[in-house]
């Protein structure tokens, strides 16, 4: 069983966002961080794009929820099949065509939290050797379950920081305390999950 971070390493942006934090704990706390970040914002604020071609807060949350659905299928294919092909997807098409601006932010976060909980449950019950199994991503090549866990934990943190930037940049009076509380490191309230090795 390998220890430490996955090889090859995850993208720098995500590695920096995660730092030395436990990726499973980071993934477990992400839905609550999102809930705190959107508290006090109106639907109009949540739907406001910070610039042309950039996603709104709701679109970012929908992206996290959509990504979690796809991630769950990747975990399952990799765990159950030998070196399965893992297809990339067009995240901008998802944002444009799946109607995130027509949803309530709280519902999008609930969707994300539900799928995330199911995926964390799967990770907890997988045998340890499954974490080293790989799939062949159409754009990035070999990816193990371990690498996906680290990458998506950093991906969450990256987008939480993006939401914080949008919130404080566009809506500075919406409550700085909420933003500060949302981005502060917290331990999940549930029992700790098995740590990646």
Show which residues each predicted segment covers.
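Short, contiguous alpha-helical
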Residues: 1-13, 47-92, 120-121, 128, ...
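Short, charged, low-complexity loops and linkers
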Residues: 9-25
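Short coil/turn segments at secondary-structure junctions
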Residues: 14-19, 96-106, 143, 147
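Amphipathic, non-membrane alpha-helical segments in soluble helical-bundle scaffolds
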Residues: 20-31, 54-61, 105-109, 146-149
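Acidic/histidine-rich alpha-helical segments that form the ligand environment
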Residues: 25-37, 93-132, 152
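A glycine-rich, hydrophobic loop/mini-helix early in the fold
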Residues: 29-55
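Short, intrinsically disordered, low-complexity terminal/loop segments
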Residues: 194-197
């Amino acid at each position: 069983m390998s220890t430490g971070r996955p090889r090859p390493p995850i993208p720098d942006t995500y590695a920096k966002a995660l730092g030395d934090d436990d990726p499973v704990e980071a993934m477990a706390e992400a839905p609550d961080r999102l809930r705190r970040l959107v508290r006090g914002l109106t639907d109009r604020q949540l739907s406001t794009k910070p610039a042309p071609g950039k996603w709104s807060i709701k679109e970012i949350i929908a992206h996290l929820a959509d990504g979690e659905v796809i991630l769950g299928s990747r975990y399952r294919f990799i765990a159950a099949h030998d070196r399965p092909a893992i297809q990339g997807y067009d995240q901008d098409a998802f944002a444009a065509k799946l109607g995130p601006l027509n949803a309530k932010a709280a519902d999008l976060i609930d969707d994300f939290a539900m799928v995330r909980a199911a995926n964390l449950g799967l990770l907890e019950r997988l045998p340890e050797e499954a974490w080293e199994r790989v799939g062949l991503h159409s754009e990035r090549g070999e990816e193990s379950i371990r690498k996906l866990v680290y990458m998506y934990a950093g991906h969450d943190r990256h987008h939480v920081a993006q939401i914080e930037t949008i919130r404080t940049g566009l809506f500075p009076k919406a409550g700085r305390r909420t933003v500060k509380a949302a981005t502060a490191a917290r331990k999940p309230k549930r029992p700790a999950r098995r740590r990646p090795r």
